[in-house]
């Protein structure tokens, strides 16, 4: 990176209209990323335009879309963008986010993408270990049901791989 370069991280989430959930999940992840990479400014964008509109109307809270966040990054002099989604799988929202971000590829020196949580078989195995460890002391007569909301996207196959 030359001296004129300025790198930043765009943390990308679907979004939530529940304030407590936002603080415990999305904001916690954003803070962890900011703490891990203090030399890189972090920006927020959400993919759910419905939730963005709801928060604007109900709470007066402005959350950027991917394109709005990238426009702001340009105004702030950012030259290199790292996009890190908080998505669980590579679904429809993730594909749309990439398309939106890549529409800016000629306006930044680089745009690179991190992966959603469950991208590789190794990711699947790691999450199974973490969940099993988290619930290892559960009463053996108690059933544990874990659900993903599912999608028509081919990435839905990850749920069968976890079974």
Pin down the residues of each PLM region.
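Active-site-proximal alpha-helix that buttresses catalytic centers in soluble enzyme cores
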Residues: 1-163
């Amino acid at each position: 990176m030359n001296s004129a370069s300025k790198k930043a991280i765009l943390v990308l989430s679907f979004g939530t209209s529940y304030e407590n959930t936002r603080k415990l999940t999305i904001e916690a992840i954003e803070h962890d990323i900011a703490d891990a990479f203090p030399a890189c400014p972090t920006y927020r964008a959400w993919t759910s335009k419905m939730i963005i509109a709801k928060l604007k109307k109900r709470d007066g809270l402005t959350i950027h879309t991917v394109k709005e966040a990238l426009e702001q990054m340009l105004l702030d002099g950012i030259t290199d963008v790292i996009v890190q989604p908080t998505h669980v799988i590579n679904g429809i929202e993730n594909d749309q986010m990439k398309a939106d971000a890549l529409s800016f590829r000629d306006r930044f020196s680089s745009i690179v993408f991190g992966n959603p949580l469950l991208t590789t078989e190794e990711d699947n195995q790691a999450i199974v270990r973490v969940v099993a460890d988290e619930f290892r002391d559960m009463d053996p007569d108690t059933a544990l049901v874990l659900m993903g909301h599912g999608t028509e996207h081919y990435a839905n196959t990850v749920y069968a791989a976890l079974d």
